[in-house]
Structures are given as C-alpha cells and as structure tokens.
Amino acid sequence: MFYQDPFDVIIIGGGHAGTEAAMAAARMGQQTLLLTHNIDTLGQMSCNPAIGGIGKGHLVKEVDALGGLMAKAIDQAGIQFRILNASKGPAVRATRAQADRVLYRQAVRTALENQPNLMIFQQAVEDLIVENDRVVGAVTQMGLKFRAKAVVLTVGTFLDGKIHIGLDNYSGGRAGDPPSIPLSRRLRELPLRVSRLKTGTPPRIDARTIDFSVLAQQHGDNPMPVFSFMGNASQHPQQVPCYITHTNEKTHDVIRNNLDRSPMYAGVIEGIGPRYCPSIEDKVMRFADRNQHQIFLEPEGLTSNEIYPNGISTSLPFDVQMQIVRSMQGMENAKIVRPGYAIEYDFFDPRDLKPTLESKFIHGLFFAGQINGTTGYEEAAAQGLLAGLNAARLSADKEGWAPARSQAYLGVLVDDLCTLGTKEPYRMFTSRAEYRLMLREDNADLRLTEMGRELGLVDDERWARFNEKLESIERERQRLKSTWVTPSAESADEVNAHLTTPLSREASGEDLLRRPEMTYAQLTSLAAFAPALEDEQAAEQVEIQVKYEGYIARQQDEIEKQLRNENTLLPATLDYRQVSGLSNEVIAKLNDHKPASIGQASRISGVTPAAISILLVWLKKQGMLRRSA
C-alpha cells in the first residue's frame, strides 16, 4: 500500500549523513521523510566517541557554516575539547572533541524532532521504486510504499554487512543491528558499480578494571574551544581527561603468533580496510620496526563505564583480544565488555555520481556517506548535507550546487570521489587540499554562510550573527589601518617593548600586527591601539587576515588561474574516441570517468597536460568550448 501523503525528499538511513541530509532538505522547505530501522539510534556513534581532527574538523566547521547540525551537537555533548596543531599555522589547526555518546545522540534526535517539514518513520527499507530510470519512492519491509521526487541513500555499513570476529562471521549492519540485505540486492540490479570495503572497531573496556594511576593523563585545552560558530563554551558538559598507554613487544608477539586466526590475513575478508586507521594487527605487520604504539583510552561518556581504546581496532578472536588488552600497562586486569570486530559492506563507485551526489544513471537518486567509499562521521555529515540540499533543489526544479575545490574541503572531498573514485575508505586530510591557506577552520563561515543563505540553509539568527561578525572585522581593520604611532610619540616606548627591533618610522596598527612577534592581544593591550574586539571570532580573523595577507593574495591568484580550467565544461555524452590525437589509455579513462570539466579531467591519473591541450583544441574546433558562469 502507498502512504497517504507524497514527500519531496526521502532519506534512507539515520546516521551522520542521513541526519544532515534530512535537516538540510527540511530547512529548505521541502517535505522530508527520514526512514530509519531504529529511531533510538539516530546519530549513533558506531565507532570512536569523537568528532573532528585534522581535515575532519574543517569539514565540521563547513557543515556548521552551511547551517548543519554536527557542530551544534558536539558542543552540547563534548567532554574534552582540544585544538590539534595549535603551534602551527592557522591552515592546519583543527578542533577535536571527545563525545558523550548518549548526549550526542540526544542532541541529534532533539534537533530532528523539532525540525519543521521533517517526519521520522521507523522501518527498514527493502526496495526502491524506479520508473524509466527515475527514482520515485521507497518500499519498507512491511510493504509500505512512500512516494517522493528525490531519494537519498545514507545506509552506512548496512548493505550486505558482514561482521568478522576471528574466523567466525555473521550478517550485521554493525554490532547489535541487522544488515540491509534486500536493499543491497536491489541496488545491485541497477546500472551501478559496486565493490566491498572493510572497517573495524576496537574492543570496549570496563573502566573499573583499569589502573589509571600508572597512566599519563591527557587533558583538554583551557580555554575550551568551541565547534559551532553559533556556540559558546558554556554549552559544554563536564570535561574529563583521556589516558595514554602503549602496546609493547609482548602485545606484538601475541598478534604475530595469532595471524593465522585473523580473517584479514587468512583471506576471509575481501574488502579493503582504511589506510589511515589500520587495525592493530596491520600496524604491527606494516611497522615491524616499531616496538610500541600509543593507545588513547577515551571515555565513552559521563555516565558510562566503557572505555574506547583508540588504536587497537581488531578482528582477531576474542581470546586473543583479551591477551592484547591485558599485555598493556594499566590494563593487566582489564575486562572487555564488547569485543572488537571488522565489518565488510557494499559501497558504490562514486565516479558514477555527479558533483551534486546524484546518480548519473538514476535521476533523483543521491548517495552520501560510507556508501560512497568514505570513512568517518565528518566526511559522512558533509556529504549528507550536500546530498540533502541537492535533493531538495531537484524536488523544487532548481539546479544543483556543489562547492569548488578552492571553496571548501567539502569541494575537495566530492571532487576527489567523483573524479578519481576510491579503492579504500577515503579519509579527509588538510594535505588533500591545494588551497589550504584559504580553507581554514576559522573562516569556514566567511567562505560558505552567504551561499548557505542563498540556498535556504541558514536561518535568520545565524545570518544576523554572521553579518555582525563581518562588520566587526571590517570596522576593526579600518581602525587599525588609520591608527598610527611615530618613533617620537609618547606611546612609542610602550610599543617598542613588544618589538624585537624598535620603530624607525611611522607605523599603523596593521603594520605592527604584521610583525611576527606581535599578536592582536598584545597590540590591543597597548594604550594607542586599545580596546580589543569583544567578539573573539572577529578578533581572530583580523589577526589572520592581516598577518597572512600577502600569502592569501598569492593563493587567490592561483585559484583564479585554475578556475579557467574548472569552468571549461565537457559534454556528458562526449565519446572521447572522436577526439583525434588522444592515446588509447586517455580515451579509456575519460570515457570511464566522464569528467564534468577540464579541471576534473586534468586530475584523472594518466591524463597528461598534453592530452588536455589536445582536448581543448578539439573542443574549440568543434564549437563546443563552453564555460560555466
């Protein structure tokens, strides 16, 4: 039977991608349905209890700048906040927070249940309704049919999921949840390329059985960082430390002696695992010269006794997991409350997607999250927001939108996936971006909030706050530009006390701030340049914009040159065999990838600059050279 009301957008799956997709579509005024197999696990942290990190924190800030949920949720649920790379330049500084799993899930569910235009329905989806290569709805396990103009698949590791512990395995979407086998079979019937990937999680430890007195503590930062541009530290719950232990030669011997019982090394697992979050058995074998690996003992919450030992993800048998855990300092009497495991699951080749995350072959069908070959909550959330907003735009008969690589880490993520694809779980790093200095955490709102407002994602409160910040930055920069001090002025002695070389000529506030030894806080503590801005975010922007002005201008020039290629469009139906002069390898790769632009084509492995030149000449001769606005 059909549900009585049609929807504009259906989201299938309530993880980090699904919740952001649902919120985005609903915020844009589209009637949205979120289908989940269990309402109680909306926003569930299936693996590590943390948000952010290098590259990942940048994505969270971008999701927040576009009105998303993740940053607000972690501000309400974070139990330890830190800035990573704090001593380095602003481009690579990244926020990370430990989370209370229960508080995080509660924050996500509360936001979803209070979002207008959004209905949540608990039922597993077993089928899609596809008519003439267009998705028009979904069918649940009890046969209930829902109609919609667009459908977003955010099903995580549930598609034909298989859990491995030692040489034993069973079907599962994650520990305690059933897999989605009928939907997996249905998707395999569609003209989509599908493969298998693998990820894993460590055993959870009972905190009451760990001797923390012999372990080093790791505390959060003070003052506490904040994730959301709309947040403040007063929202954070109680803060707690993490602890550090290490593996040792005994640990490594246990692992080496039991590799024949590892499903990965025994050849039972087909899927490729994450390169940057390897299992402990993988680390021991790949880094055989290392006699120890650092393990972070992370609390799972304020009201839980469970500890997440970050760094010992494993699929070895339970008895071996016990030996591994008890071989480490402080853990000699530790008890495991949940075994570690590996999970193998279907993913779909993201090269079959447009940059909007819509399928190239099934109109109105969008993919986001681990189904696209990524790993991590943050990567999933960013894709979910993009897929949700584009599903909403499609349902409203509007053109899709995707950020450029020069505009956002989200743009880098989507371009990497859709242009290059992935053979292993993809994780975001700052090193993946060519324009890191422009794509900082601190300026995510300056880069994206205006576009978010145009798209209908940003509410009035955020928009007002954003404009206040912009005005504060502009006013303060003008004030510093127009405030001068001379070597003979009474205030010169106070200024010189903060400088490595004293003033030799007249200098403005901005001139002084450009000096490496002068910070904004120091400058505005001087009588001549007081007072400082009360808005700490605006003050940070003033300092970064002034200090890095030359570098930023140079990178902006590079971006403008690159945009000429990015904006040169390639016809979606072009058969590259028509282009004389291209090698067979280049023809095969271009026909396989079907890049949307010259810029995308240039990033495909094996497509040479010479091939790009041939292609540009051919397009011009054919009168097909078009540039996007």
Swiss-Prot record:
tRNA processing in keyword set: yes
Assembly and binders: Homodimer. Heterotetramer of two MnmE and two MnmG subunits.
Principal subcellular localization: cytoplasm
Main function: NAD-binding protein involved in the addition of a carboxymethylaminomethyl (cmnm) group at the wobble position (U34) of certain tRNAs, forming tRNA-cmnm(5)s(2)U34.
InterPro entries: FAD/NAD-bd_sf (IPR036188), GIDA_C_N (IPR049312), MnmG (IPR004416), MnmG-rel (IPR002218), MnmG-rel_CS (IPR020595), MnmG_C (IPR026904), MnmG_C_subdom (IPR047001), MnmG_C_subdom_sf (IPR044920)
Keyword Ribosomal protein listed: no
Gene that encodes the chain: mnmG
Subcellular location: Cytoplasm
Source lineage: Bacteria, Pseudomonadati, Pseudomonadota, Gammaproteobacteria, Enterobacterales
GO function term, MF aspect, one: flavin adenine dinucleotide binding
Keywords: Cytoplasm, FAD, Flavoprotein, NAD, tRNA processing
Residues where NAD(+) binds: 273-287
Superkingdom as given in the UniProt entry: Bacteria
GO biological process: tRNA methylation; tRNA wobble uridine modification
A Pfam family that the UniProt record links to this protein: SAM_GIDA_C
PROSITE patterns cross-referenced by the UniProt entry: GIDA_1, GIDA_2
Xref: HAMAP family: MnmG_GidA
Family, per entry: Belongs to the MnmG family.
Protein name in the entry: tRNA uridine 5-carboxymethylaminomethyl modification enzyme MnmG
Binding annotation for FAD: 13-18, 125, 180, 370
Swiss-Prot/TrEMBL cofactor(s): FAD
SUPFAM superfamilies per UniProt: FAD/NAD(P)-binding domain
Protein source organism: Salmonella dublin (strain CT_02021853)
